[in-house]
Amino acid sequence: MIIEHSAEVRGKTPLYRHLYVQVLAAIAAGILLGHFYPDIGTELKPLGDAFIRLVKMIIAPVIFLTVATGIAGMTDLAKVGRVAGKAMIYFLAFSTLALVVGLVVANVVQPGAGMHIDPASLDAKAVATYAEKAHEQSITGFLMNIIPTTLVGAFAEGDILQVLFISVLFGISLAIVGKKAEPVVDFLQALTLPIFRLVAILMKAAPIGAFGAMAFTIGKYGIASIANLAMLIGTFYLTSFLFVFIVLGAVARYNGFSILSLIRYIKEELLLVLGTSSSEAALPGLMNKMEKAGCKRSVVGLVIPTGYSFNLDGTNIYMTLAALFIAQATDTPLSYGDQILLLLVAMLSSKGAAGITGAGFITLAATLSVVPSVPVAGMALILGIDRFMSECRALTNFVGNAVATIVVAKWEGELDQAQLSAALGGEASVEAIPAVVQPAE
């Protein structure tokens, strides 16, 4: 699907009509309201929740149409396996690197040193729910959950990996049938237009959702709660910033594009993630923009939904950094062997808890429960600020998946470099999400 807007028309668009400006203003208004009128702010949570539900409602159709039509158009079905294999290699490499970065930074900065907190004085009940959910997760259970019990159930539940699983199988079956399936493929391609137009309509509510979510966050937790653990928050934000601009920036430069240009290209989606703390809210927009930036639909459809479960750079940085913070704060010594064990467990548990609400915190609980040296009760120290850290996790995860999509597309020879340069340089009308704010009149 292509939604075109000429550069000339876009140049005349008033600033206030751009989605990123509206969302940014809404975030600022939400912070002010939540700070000065916290009681009112906490009552606005339904606005953020309703918007996220609206977007989640459309995620399954977007993934299905993108993946099924993309694979159906492939003449070489072996390419599906190659794309998936290359994506998983990339995900494993950079997820591990993110875990190592968090571990190294925690050892160098030591954000929890000097706190001298007795684990026995902490309220373990506060994190009991997360620990219980963590014990329910396993690698086997996670893999089995990818296969839905019914065809309709995957779409009804909105499980991304289940929908992706069905979409891949259906796309392969369409490709095998060949010409006889062309009417079905044509129908699905035609259905793509109204589905993405619906996404455009839903995105008009993004400022309202961001306003409600931010007002609730500040109203409930307060800006003052940040000051108590400012060292940990600052370390995590700075580490994530450096990971994006140095590590991912180097990957981008090696593959022929600029990380700054990419961030500028997806700024509307990033602000949406910031306002809602949910990367899922921007998934349809990211898939659309990556396709318009020159990545083939088949690659976009496979890499992005899979990356939402397996390519969580921000979450991985958070896990090892937070685990060592708890150890330092509670004066729990960790040998190099303990830290290597922590790293290995985190590599597995980060996959077992993928796709779960509050996955970052639950994954941390799962990791600590297997590494006996670090007290799980220590998670109570960061429970109050986790909401503020989740925004940075989501943003880092989001940028990581955008970079991964372009890189895998280039590896597979499914990237139009000229179209990518035009999109990131703003020289061509390849953006789809601006249509969210300014539909053709």
Swiss-Prot record:
A molecular function GO annotation: succinate transmembrane transporter activity
GO process annotations (BP): L-aspartate transmembrane transport
InterPro entries noted in UniProt: C4_dicarb_transport, Na-dicarboxylate_symporter, Na-dicarboxylate_symporter_CS, Na:dicarbo_symporter_sf
Annotated membrane topology: Multi-pass membrane protein
Keyword terms, alphabetized: Cell inner membrane, Cell membrane, Membrane, Plasmid, Symport, Transmembrane, Transmembrane helix, Transport
Cytoplasmic side: 1-30, 88-99, 169-171, 229-241, 301-320, 370-378, 425-441
Highest taxon above the source species: Bacteria
A GO cellular-component term linked to this record: plasma membrane
Record function comment: Responsible for the transport of dicarboxylates such as succinate, fumarate, and malate from the periplasm across the inner membrane. This transport system plays an important role in the energy supply of rhizobium-legume symbionts.
UniProt cross-references to NCBIfam families, sorted A to Z: PRK01663.1, PRK13027.1
Record-given protein name: C4-dicarboxylate transport protein
Organism: Rhizobium meliloti (strain 1021) (Ensifer meliloti)
Gene this chain is encoded by: dctA
